[in-house]
Structures are given as structure tokens and as C-alpha cells.
């Protein structure tokens, strides 16, 4: 039972946490900057002593001792009003938004550092690109990214991000903006500066950069559909649509670059069966905006709770997941789609009452995952995890995912090499097991190449003359060398992973 079920009483101030409770909560936030502190607890199987375990345990204690009421916490990163139930957080922020009492939200890292978020702008539901037309839009950029794989089939983060940002500009702004990398840089600068003194200058630069695309919109893009929607209703114009386009581009860019890669990792380990469930699970488990702070600029009352101006409301859905009856280890239900919209804080935006641009970004991510998996099979190289033990945090920049061609078939009479160069590229900074996984993948590729060479040598077309027989011997010799190399690499990989 949440406070939403309680009868209204006279308004009163939120209860303050005790000094020891503040100290434990602060220590848990500081520890988020030290990922290695989880290693001893995980090695002993004591998940309750990890950073997230301690935080959730403290929140469960506060929820019991405060009857589920929001509590005022004091930390080295500032005082926060923390709702202890997801329903309470949603209700409190909705009431504040309705009263016009909220300043724009800022993001909060796990270690307590604040960062700018793209200012939320409503996006008309019927202005989004229809799902049926999204299938064709990502194809060209997905093919470019797949072609940019390294020799061992893995993806370089910079190449992946560059390709996904191209795709995002194509879908949101139009074909003319695909090569406009400066647009992405200006957008990133404006987003990071949100809420600071330099924001207006950066926002003006972003408006200038978007102006040509708004003046001559691509009808197949989100911008074209948004302007057509506004003109059909006699509303606004190109300049009025600029903030909505910028917000949608920021969210789609992040979903395509980060969430899609996480979804591919989930598919690789069998933690999701379809692109829709993979994207939904990635956004649920590792939301790009995992925590947000909402400054209150005017007094308001939510039920019997009086919230004063100057208060900062902290909303962290991940911490409350287990407390609200949803197990932290549960997966998204089969058939779930993040694009359908779910109650609670949008995973890509800190809007207090939902965000249509987030739903559109999730839909784009689903189509990108579908386009990738229609051509290649994702293989997780590092970090290592399994479907039944997914990590609490997963930085997409640390993911090493290999893409294996679906069309490659060993021993079919043709020489099949996935990529022109089959030289593995080391993953600097990873554990020996990660190098071992790369070596295993290289050994498998060498073995397949040896099999395809042997199958090619067995073709009857070489029987027609002396030159054919001589060339067959060359093929067989090369196949033998590849097989021997595969055995050697596999032995080395075994030593690395043992």
C-alpha cells in the first residue's frame, strides 16, 4: 500500500532521515564511484553487501520505518526528497508539474555527479514516422556499420557510435543531415550545458544549425512529418518545431548508440528472444537516464505532504524496483515493447509525466536491432555475463560485441571468409578471459576457413587437368596450415580462460 491509498490529512513537512541513515546513504552513493568494491561480496555470493544491495537494503529499511512516506535525506551531493515507492514518485512529480512548480530536471550519476539533460518538449503522437516505414530507413547505415567491423568481427565503439549517429540524423532530420557531424556536436554541447549559464548561447547555435533542415524538411523524416502535422493544424512553424526536433534527435541518438548495443548483448547471451524484448529489457535494466533531480521552484502540496520551494526531488526507478514487488533480476515479459510506453520515469528523458520522443526512440532502436540481427549474429566477447546473472550496470562503451555473418556456411564447396583481414585486434585493458574469448572466436574462424578450403579442393572441377590438380594441392596445404593454426590458437585461448 502506497501513500496514494491513504486518506488526506493536514499538510505536513517530509520526515527527515536520522544522521546514521544519511551517512549510510551517502557512503553508498560515494561507493558507486568505486566499482571494484563489489568484487569481494560477489566472490562470496553476498549480493546484499554490494553497492546496489546496500542501497536497496537501506531504502527498504526507510520504507518500513517511515510507513512508505517520502523522506528527506542529506548527502555530500545535496539534500534530496526521496520518494520510497515508484507510484509515489510518479504522483508527486505529476502534482508538481500540474502546479507548475518544477524547474527543468538534471541527470545524476551513480556517484552523485550532475549532468545536463535534453530539455523535454512534447512530441505529437501522430507526428512520428510510422513503424512500417522505419524498416527501410536504417538499412544503409546498418550495412555501413557491419562493413566497418574489425578483423575479428568485433565493433570499434567509435565506428559504431559514428554510424548510429548518422542513422539518427537520417531518421529524425532527413537525408540532407546524414553527413552533418557538426549538428551532432552542437547538439551534444547544448545538452551538456542545459541548466548552465552557457546554455542559451549553445541553444542558439543549435537553432541556427537546424534552420536549413526545418526550412526544407525531408518528408520521410520525423522533422517533415512534424512540420506537416503542425501546418495541417495551423500551428507554429519551422522555428517552433526546432526544440521538439532537437529533443527527439538527442533521444534517438542515445538509444541507437547505447541501447541497441546493450540489446545485442542481451540477445547474444539469450536473455531476450526478440528485438522488442531486448530493447525493452535494456532500457528497463540500464536506462540511459537512471536517476534525475527535480528542483522545486514553488510550494505545492501532494496529498498531505507539503513540499517547499528549494526542495530537490530525487527519482531513481532502479533502486525502487525490488521494493515495489518487481524483482531486480526479473526480465521484461515476453512480447514487451518499450515503444508502447510504460508507467514511471521515461528511461531516456526526465519528463515528470511521460515522453512521446522516448517511445519513438525505443521504436527506432527496435528496428535497428531487427536490421542488425537480420544480417549477422551478435556474439558477446566482453564483459562476460550470462542470461541468469546480468550485471547491475553496463556501460555500452565497455561492451565488446562481435557480429558473425549468418550467410557464412562451412564446407559448402566455396571459400568463405567473413572479412578480408582475419587478424584479431586486441581489446586493450580487458581481463585475460576477454582476450581468451577473442582468441576462441579467431580459432573458430580459422577452423571454418580450413573447412571451406578443403571443401573447395574437393570440387570435381579441378580434375580436368594438371594445373587443376596442382592448385588443389595448394588449397589442401593451405587448409592444413589453417587447421594447425586453429589448434594452436585454441590451446592459447584455453590457457587464458582457465
What are these regions (language model features)?
Residues 2-107:
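N-terminal membrane-proximal hinge/A-helix region immediately C-terminal to the signal-anchor transmembrane segment
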Residues 51-63, 273-305, 315-324:
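Conserved cytochrome P450 K-helix E-x-x-R motif and the immediately C-terminal K′/meander segment
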Residues 74-78, 135-140, 147-170, 180-182, ...:
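Cytochrome P450
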Residues 182-239:
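Cytochrome P450 catalytic core segment centered on helix I
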Residues 225-283, 357, 365:
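Central I-helix of cytochrome P450 enzymes
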Residues 316-352, 382-386:
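Conserved cytochrome P450 K-helix/beta-meander segment immediately N-terminal to the heme-binding cysteine loop
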Residues 351, 409-498:
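N-terminal secretion-targeting helices of virulence/extracellular proteins
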Residues 359-392:
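Cytochrome P450 heme-binding "Cys pocket" and the immediately downstream C-terminal segment
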